[in-house]
Design a protein with these regions (language model features):
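Acidic-and-aromatic substrate-binding clefts and catalytic sites of carbohydrate-active enzymes
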Residues: 40, 70-71, 136
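Solvent-exposed loop/turn segments connecting transmembrane beta-strands
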Residues: 4, 70-72, 165-167
Length: 186
């Protein structure tokens, strides 16, 4: 993988999330997410938006890390489904929204997102929960990948390694996707 230019890498890793790429890409924006954090955790939360150029056209990717309080997460999930954010992405542009949502399936933030996007776990018909947290003994599935109709997931796995266990308290999700040539704008 090629690292992002240093200035972009510093910006993108500011709130504990990062983006690295193999293909040509451009950073659309890195934003601090809204919502009042709970008293026990005053961490800033963010989202990084990038466009990746593929042989089939542009793919829009948003990497995020939502807060710990349920009200904070709900406000943040509503941001991603707002008219402003949806209008910024062309209707047929493949979209992947991924990250640490700190939300279980069935929670209000999760339901807010799944009304507009599809959960990769459900699309590949995972036979059991794909647990990512905590790395010491993963019992919760709070990390998710959502896609729109222009993206077809092919696989979803949890990357479990000694290095992943050291790098974070969450194991990373890894997914492969297919894009429909007629749905990818140039």
């Amino acid at each position: 993988m090629e690292p992002l230019p240093r200035a972009v890498w510093l910006l993108c890793s500011w709130f504990g999330i990062s983006f690295r790429r193999r293909k040509r890409s451009n950073l659309r924006r890195a934003v601090e997410l809204p919502g009042k954090p709970p008293f026990f955790c005053r961490e800033n939360r963010a989202a990084i938006e990038v466009n990746i150029e593929t042989d089939l056209g542009k793919v829009h990717i948003i990497n995020t890390h939502l807060g710990l309080g349920w009200r904070e997460r709900l406000v943040q999930a509503q941001l991603f489904t707002s008219a402003e954010w949806r209008a910024a992405i062309a209707g047929d542009t493949p979209l992947i929204l991924l990250g640490d949502f700190n939300s279980l399936r069935g929670s209000r933030p999760y339901r807010t997102l799944s009304r507009h996007l599809r959960d990769v776990r459900e699309l590949i018909q995972a036979t059991g929960p794909i647990r990512t947290f905590p790395t010491r003994f993963p019992v919760l599935a709070v990390d998710h990948i959502f896609v729109n109709g222009a993206v077809q997931p092919l696989s979803l796995t949890v990357h479990r390694s000694a290095l992943a266990r050291i790098a974070s308290d969450h194991f990373p999700l890894m997914a492969e996707f297919a894009l429909s040539p007629h749905r990818c704008p140039e």
